[in-house]
Amino acid sequence: TLQGQKDVIELLKEEGLRDKIKVMVGGAPATQAWADKIGADCYAENASEAVAKAKELLA
């Protein structure tokens, strides 16, 4: 869920892990604007795009 995505980022911040873990969000209700709002590192519209963006994040 969108709230779950936001919660994960908040928990990572609380545990001091946010700068060590990349977060990609997606799914039907998610958008780039949502990813920006919650502080995600990346947004992908679909699985194929997620693979390409994951490779970019890890490069």
From Swiss-Prot:
Write out the entry's keywords from A to Z: Cobalt, Methanogenesis
Q: Name one GO molecular function term.
A: cobalamin binding
B12-binding domain segment(s): 1-59
PROSITE patterns assigned to the protein according to its UniProt record, in alphabetical order: B12_BINDING
GO BP annotation list? methanogenesis
Q: Which SUPFAM superfamilies match?
A: Cobalamin (vitamin B12)-binding domain
Q: Which InterPro entries match?
A: Cobalamin-bd, Cobalamin-bd_sf
Q: In which pathway does it act?
A: One-carbon metabolism; methanogenesis from dimethylamine
The record describes the protein's role as: Acts as a methyl group carrier between MtbB and MtbA.
Family per record: Belongs to the methylamine corrinoid protein family.
Name used for this protein in its record: Dimethylamine corrinoid protein
**Originating organism:** Methanosarcina thermophila
